[in-house]
């Protein structure tokens, strides 16, 4: 059946003319480019017949080297050879310093706290390094397809935040690529397996690459992909397996933990070779310098068990978020070269109670799926109809309200693209400006969420508190990028911002935000209720104080005023504590003792308005 076609700007106005578009898997360890040829999606090889391009960039004084030769030069030229740059995309220098032991580079801070890597050609940003990899893939594709590309679908981990996604788009632009869309890697894998055409039900995509882990739970209905939930870890992957083996070698060989960059690189290469050998063998002899020892698969499994357990914990969380049971998952797709590790496959099979799908090369499956989507977005009709992909945002988006509270506007796991609006008002009389603080996270207090951006809405007409109506609109596009606007509906004044944070989340912060939201859910609810009661109490105190200053002497006797002021003082003292119930009850008492005063003020206002006017004037 024909499904709803995704139509985006730039599609071909000539549907019978095939436009050249590719899918790119920009990976931590390796990258690939794929395209549809003769109706089949396949990876494109270079002149030597190699499909996989190592994500390695080596800088010389007068040229740039990309790929396998650059990777092999890493031990001898570690400071000019950049590996695993995907881990640095969208991050700040402070984040990078936490990875210092794993990254043998010299870093300098650039604009917006971006880390630059010192090379023989000068400082290079992660965006520039990634652009070199993308440039080679673009040139390979144009040579293989015999023409200029109209664009590419580039895959990213589902857990990439706004900064990391924007950095990826910037790298593509620098490489001369038009980005048709950023596509979550797990979703691309589902497309590659043709699950949109042959299956209905719930599918899990387990994606363990070189530097990142993603789990996505998809529901497939009539060819439509709906991502029910996503999870993962931006700092978990095959690189960590290598570091675990390297640690085993250091301990066994009695090496110093403080190694120079070249030694670190050669050590990691030996560790990686051992890991790959254990994929098919029960044991491997590891040789490092004069030291040699046998590493068995059982010992290797024990080394990586904590990391495998971390991935399964994220899987259980994603299944819970999707509101499905484990036995409802009908298929598990394995993605990423690290899923070749036998212990990983065993653990996934044990958890889901079924053997995972591994028929398509896990290193190629993402690029193959991205190419299918790229062909559709380029305007080329897909045999069997088009497909609709519904991705989701990984963390809730919202803004700060009075009392330091997080008001969620778009909940996590909402399908994108999406636009949501919510109305807010002013807190004080005569307020003419409002600060809009955009946040990301699952907790109730802003101190426990991540700040994304701030902007001011100015020019609000002065009114009494609560009279102005400000509509705040959140929009998340198909690439997961956020824009926020605020508009005062009466005057039409408006302000907006596109959220492009200068760096991303620190290692473990994404997973920790979700973990904390569950762990502290009860405490957060109590804290939110307390803050709301404190805000209500403060608002009442300010209103009563304003009324006393304006009309207290005229409308109250000394005893009445003293009673009100005593109740205000007691409420102020309670607000400094944490007894929410006491604050609520005292707020009610203050409201009650001021009822008569409020009625007198209203009568006085009405009398003043009617003074000197006859009945006929009022009726007119």
UniProtKB/Swiss-Prot annotation:
Key words, A-Z: ATP-binding, Chaperone, Nucleotide-binding
GO molecular function per UniProt: ATP binding; ATP hydrolysis activity; ATP-dependent protein folding chaperone; unfolded protein binding
InterPro entries in alphabetical order: ATPase_NBD, Heat_shock_70_CS, HscA_NBD, HSP70_C_sf, HSP70_peptide-bd_sf, Hsp_70_fam, ISC_FeS_clus_asmbl_HscA
Top-level taxonomic group: Bacteria
NCBIfam families: HscA (TIGR01991), PRK05183.1 (NF003520)
HAMAP family associated with the record: HscA
Protein name: Chaperone protein HscA homolog
Species this chain originates from: Pseudomonas fluorescens (strain ATCC BAA-477 / NRRL B-23932 / Pf-5)
Gene name, Swiss-Prot/TrEMBL: hscA
């Amino acid at each position: 059946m024909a499904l709803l076609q995704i139509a985006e700007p730039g599609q071909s106005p000539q549907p019978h003319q095939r436009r050249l578009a590719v899918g790119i898997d920009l990976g931590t360890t390796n990258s690939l480019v794929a395209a549809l040829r003769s109706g089949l999606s396949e990876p494109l090889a270079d002149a030597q017949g190699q499909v996989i391009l190592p994500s390695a960039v080596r800088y010389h004084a007068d040229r740039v080297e990309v790929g396998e030769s650059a990777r092999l030069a890493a031990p001898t030229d570690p400071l000019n050879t950049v590996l695993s740059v995907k881990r640095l995309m969208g991050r700040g220098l402070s984040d990078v310093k936490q990875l210092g032991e794993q990254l043998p580079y010299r870093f300098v801070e650039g604009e917006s706290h971006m880390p630059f890597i010192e090379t023989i050609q000068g400082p290079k940003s992660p965006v520039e390094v990634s652009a070199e990899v993308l440039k080679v893939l673009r040139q390979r594709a144009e040579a293989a397809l015999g023409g200029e590309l109209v664009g590419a679908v580039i895959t990213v981990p589902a857990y990439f935040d706004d900064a990391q996604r924007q950095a990826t788009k910037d790298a593509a632009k620098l490489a001369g690529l038009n980005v048709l869309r950023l596509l979550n890697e797990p979703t691309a894998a589902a497309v590659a397996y043709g699950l949109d055409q042959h299956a209905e039900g719930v599918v899990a995509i387990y994606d363990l690459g070189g530097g990142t882990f993603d789990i996505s739970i998809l529901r497939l209905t009539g060819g439509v992909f709906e991502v029910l939930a996503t999870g993962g870890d931006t700092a978990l992957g095959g690189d960590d397996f290598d570091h675990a083996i390297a640690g085993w070698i250091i301990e066994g060989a009695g090496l110093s933990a403080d190694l120079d960059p070249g030694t670190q690189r050669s050590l990691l290469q030996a560790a990686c070779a051992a890991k790959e050998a254990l994929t098919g063998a029960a044991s491997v002899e590891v040789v490092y310098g004069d030291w040699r020892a046998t590493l068995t698969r059982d010992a290797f499994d024990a080394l990586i068990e904590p990391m495998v357990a971390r991935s399964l914990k994220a899987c259980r969380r994603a299944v819970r978020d999707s509101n499905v049971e484990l036995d409802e998952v009908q298929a598990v797709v394995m993605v990423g070269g690290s899923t070749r590790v036998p212990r990983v496959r065993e653990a996934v099979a044990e958890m889901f109670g079924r053997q995972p799908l591994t028929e398509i090369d896990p290193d190629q499956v993402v690029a193959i799926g991205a190419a299918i989507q790229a062909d559709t977005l380029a305007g080329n009709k897909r045999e069997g109809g088009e497909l609709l992909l519904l991705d989701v945002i990984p963390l809730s988006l919202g803004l700060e309200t009075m009392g330091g509270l997080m008001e969620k506007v778009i909940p996590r796991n909402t399908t994108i693209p999406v636009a949501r609006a919510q109305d807010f008002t002013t807190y004080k009389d005569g307020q003419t400006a409002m600060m809009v603080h955009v946040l990301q996270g699952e907790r109730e207090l802003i101190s426990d969420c991540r700040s994304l951006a701030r902007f001011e809405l100015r020019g609000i007409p002065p009114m009494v508190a609560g009279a102005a109506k400000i509509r705040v609109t959140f929009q998340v596009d198909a690439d997961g990028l956020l824009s926020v606007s605020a508009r005062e509906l009466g005057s039409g004044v408006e302000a907006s911002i596109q959220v492009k944070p200068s760096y991303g989340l620190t290692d473990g912060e994404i997973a920790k935000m979700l973990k904390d939201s569950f762990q502290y859910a009860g405490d957060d609810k109590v804290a939110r209720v307390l803050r709301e009661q404190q805000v209500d109490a403060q608002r009442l105190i300010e209103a009563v104080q304003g009324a006393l200053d304006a009309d207290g002497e005229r409308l109250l006797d000394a005893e009445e005023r003293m009673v009100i002021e005593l109740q205000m003082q007691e409420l102020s003292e309670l607000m400094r504590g944490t007894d929410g119930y006491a604050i609520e009850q005292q707020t009610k008492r203050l409201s009650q003792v001021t009822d008569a005063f409020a009625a007198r003020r209203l009568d006085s206002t009405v009398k003043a308005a009617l003074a000197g006017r006859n009945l006929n004037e009022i009726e007119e």
